[in-house]
Amino acid sequence: MNKELTAMIFDIQSYSVHDGPGCRTNVFFVGCPLQCRWCANPESWKLKKHLMFADRTCKWDQGCKACIDACPHGSITFDADGRPSVNWVICNECETIECVNSCAAGSLKQCVRILTVDDLMKILKRDFSNWGAEGGVTFSGGEPLLQHEYLDEVLQRCHQLQMQTAIETSGYARQDVFLKIFRNIDFAFIDVKNMDDELHKWGTGVSNE
C-alpha cells in the first residue's frame, strides 16, 4: 500500500490578486535550498514545523506564564520589562513545541500545516468558483520544487479539473524534477537570482552551476 503524500505548507492565501493573472489562491510551501539575503519569507527555509509568537495577544500582563512552564528547553523567559522573550535559535530547532498547546490565548502557533493532497484539493475546489476566467492557483514558497512528488500529484489533479496553474520558483532543482513539474504548469515566474556564480553564492549561499 502506497503511503499517502503529504506536504508542509506555511500559508494559503485565498482571493489574492498577486502572483499571476486574475483572482488566485496562493499556496506557500515550506523548505528552500537557497537562503537569499533578501528573502521575504525566511521562516520558510527549513523543511520542518515553525513557531509563531503574537505578542499583541499574549496575556503576560495578566500574570500568565503557561508557555514558560511548558517549555522543556528554557527557551521562553521574561525580559527586563516582564514580557515573554523567545530564543528563536532554540525554538526553531524544536520538534515538539509543547508551548503551543499550553497557550490559552493562541499567541503561540505552529505556522506550518501538514496537508494531504486531498486536503489541499478540498481548499482549491472551494475557491475555484471565485477565480473567474483568468484566475487559478499559484504554488510558491519557500521553493515548491523541493516537495515535488506532492506538487506533481496536485498539479495533475488541478488540470483534470481545468484549474489554471502557476508557479513561483528559483528553478533550483534537478532537471528531471523541473521538467516533470512543468508538464502541468500554465504560467511561471522563474526567479533567476544572479548570472555570476560568485555573486549568486554570496546572495543565496549556493552555486548556480
PLM features: what roles do these ranges have?
Residues 1, 7-9, 52, 114, ...:
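Radical SAM enzyme [4Fe-4S]-AdoMet core and its adjacent flexible, acidic
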Residues 118-209:
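Conserved AdoMet/S-adenosylmethionine-binding subsite of the radical SAM
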Residues 105-112, 198-204:
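Acidic/glycine-enriched edge-of-secondary-structure segments
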Residues 26-39, 51-75, 83-106, 112, ...:
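Cysteine-centered iron-sulfur cluster-binding motifs in ferredoxin-type domains/subunits
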Residues 2-42, 46-50:
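N-terminal cysteine/histidine-rich coordination modules
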Residues 12, 42, 88-89, 111, ...:
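Fold-independent oxyanion-binding glycine-rich loops
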Residues 75-84, 99, 108-119, 123-134:
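Fe-S ferredoxin-like electron-transfer domains
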Residues 49, 81-82, 94, 111, ...:
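Residues at secondary-structure transition points
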